[in-house]
Curated annotation (Swiss-Prot):
GO biological process: one example: transmembrane transport
Pfam families: AA_permease
GO CC annotation: plasma membrane
Protein name per UniProt: L-asparagine permease
Subcellular compartments: Cell membrane
Keyword Signal: no
Amino acid sequence: MSKDAVDTAQVAAHPQATGTIPADAGDAGYSKDLKARHVNMIAIGGAIGTGLFLGAGGRLRDAGPALAIAYLVAGVFAFFVVKALGELVLYRPSSGSFVSYAREFLGEKGAYVAGWMYFLNWSTTGIADITAIALYTHYWSMFTSIPQWVLALVALAVVLAVNLISVKIFGEMEFWFAIVKVATLVGFMLIGIFLLATQHEVSGQTPGMGMITDHGGILPHGVMPVVLVMQGVIFSYAALELVGVAAGETAEPHKIVPRAVNSIMWRVALFYVGSVVLLALLLPSSLYSGDESPFVTVLSGIGVPAAGDVMNLVVLTAAMSSLNSGLYSTGRILRSMAMAGSAPRFTGVMSRSQVPYGGILLTCAVCVLGVGLNYLVPSKAFEIVLNVASLGIISTWVIIMICHLVFVRRARAGLVERPGFRLPGSPVTEIVTIAFLLAVVGLMWNDEEVGRKTVLLVPVIAVMLVAGWFGVRRRVAHQAGQERPAPRE
């Protein structure tokens, strides 16, 4: 990477040198309006989304009760990634998050790849979200006459408006979205535990271990289905790294981030693993479906009135939350890239309310293409973009772990200082996590229908990234030459 980028980062790590130069040119101008409660609930919201409320049904049917093990394993590695990112945040808080760290530890090419792969993840996830919102809205008969693409466009417009107002409004919206999701899960788990304890029948089935032992055991379809659902399981955890982006807009990241990151592990265990275990004990896995929330399947099985309506509203909330987070994070990431020259200049523009609206609007533009996808192939839109998004998040996590490896190596050389909040077991933890993530991509090849197509996208994306780099490298070099840190006074 350029010497200037390193110098800038080192100045940020040692503010006594000059307290006026930000660590990343893209960090300047942000408000610090996100409070501890916002970041804590953003961490929760990132761990609970449509991947659980809707996706768990189809995965439970395909993989059986062993899905809980898949969520646990992926959850542990997701925690390692966020722990590593949390350590980097405490070393140097930045709204550019891992893109800023990639710039420091991997150079401008690393930052370029990290940023655009993250944009690929969230822009395609945004398409998936507005597609999901349209599908969920069609659940109610009053909306069935409205075309899916119209509903998708309305959802995008509403969330865009919220993001353009201020970061405080974003934080409040995410706070209440998370409250709804957590309250729903807690309520369901209490009902599920009651059904289990009282042996109350669900759809004519008696809850208990018999739902597992009498229906093929933990692996009713073997190991391979569990391996194949791992891609979707990782996608379920895709917003956890949002904590690192949000840290750049908090007044006290050194107090807030460790608490938020450390709470992720037990939330994963409770909400994902606990919920899936409970679902497996309440009904045979074969009775769940990818077309219906597993929670609706259970609640409808005990005759709860309007169970489908309530859960559909919650899943709708989860999709809106994901779209909200995607616009927020890509706006900040693209601004960091624009200030370094690797993204269009207009994505670096800030509004008077300190919102990087240029990057947000670019993400929305891609989502509008998704509206077109909803118009052309409404039945396939969700599946198409989900595969692309999964590659984006896996590459982002790999880059975070590589950045942390370089960071630790420099710390051992005495070039930087590690904070007290650390990823344990380095460098083994990073290497094992990277190996796991790459293995997930490789094993997708065994899924001929979907996974193989996803893997074949890798060289296509690589060619696009290389072509894009040749298009921006001169501007990146020029920008690096312009942004030399101010001399000490």
